[in-house]
Amino acid sequence: MTGKPPKHDVWKVLETRDVFAAPPWLKVQSQRVALPDGRVVDDYHRVTLPDYAMMFCETEDGRVLVLRQYKHGVGAVSLTFPAGTFNAGEDAFTCAQRELMEETGYVAGEWRSLGRYVTHANAYGNAAHLFHATDCRKVAEANSGDLEEMELLLMTREELFAAAAEGQFMLTSQIGMLALVTHPILGKTVGKKV
């Protein structure tokens, strides 16, 4: 596809009402919306969750920091990359640095922002702010304060691919991050140095 994408009209929000709220973790809204063709949808539901940062972190010798932890939403143990939600007033990069330290005890020498991606376009959900951190080194003990127990693993890229093929990554965001960073073209062209 070249040139400008085709134009699509935006839906007009006529009314919004809160259905459920559990701040800061979850808000469900019902919207009345007018479609470009004139139809009106009386109950379009939106779910809002907090934005988060997720990091693909490589040590100086090229191993990747991976967490093995129970994820109650899927009721299973999964491999994940370090990640976490924003604190009030925090920007994406500050969140990424804080979460890396809290969950692993590591800091990174170099950072690249890989962009902001919405996790569920039809319901909004939240946005994932992705980062590639390199030259990571351990400077402290992990102290995340999270509900989940975490086991920190140092894996090669080949081990990550094998784990993904075996279904050890339960979340699409993790597979997307792995593909984005390791793709021979995208991995070198997406993002900017922070």
Predicted regions: what is each one?
Residues 8-11, 47-49, 53-98, 146:
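Conserved Nudix-box catalytic region and its N-terminal flanking loop in Nudix hydrolases
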Residues 17-54, 60:
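Acidic, metal-coordinating catalytic segment for phosphate/diphosphate chemistry
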Residues 18-24, 117-129, 186:
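Acidic pyrophosphate-coordinating catalytic loop
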Residues 36-38, 59-61, 70, 133-138, ...:
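Short loop segments at secondary-structure junctions
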Residues 80, 130, 154:
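Short aromatic/basic micro-patch
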